[in-house]
Amino acid sequence: MENARIKAIAVSKETGNLSLADDSGLSVEALGGAPGIYSSRYASSDKERIEKLLAELKPFSNRKAKFECALCIASGEEVLIEVSGFCEGLITFSPKGENGFGYDPIFEVSGLGETFAEMDYEKKKQIGHRGNAFKFLRPELKKLFA
């Protein structure tokens, strides 16, 4: 949540407007939560990030993982809303699917047997971490602007 908060406050202060910031990441249980907040900087490209993560997971049987999304709305220095959402799953042994980006080809959603990259956008939006975070944001926005 801290990164979303930092981003939202910085943009709101710079623009003088309300700001919504997102910070998302993939946490892998066997790797102590890595790549976590460093998900986008874990390697230099999506392909290299996937290869690195799969290589680091080779010695582990535990492939549990979770995508998390933190959303923050700020006005100047004031944080107005903070919510988060997540989606649990497993890291596959090899990439599957053509849709999405980032770690989507190796993140298999718990109970569904398919990766984010095998899903269409609408399905991913409904069950994914960002979609879940925005589901929590909606009622908070209604309260804020009531």
Residue ranges and their predicted role:
Residues M1-A146:
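Anionic-ligand binding patches
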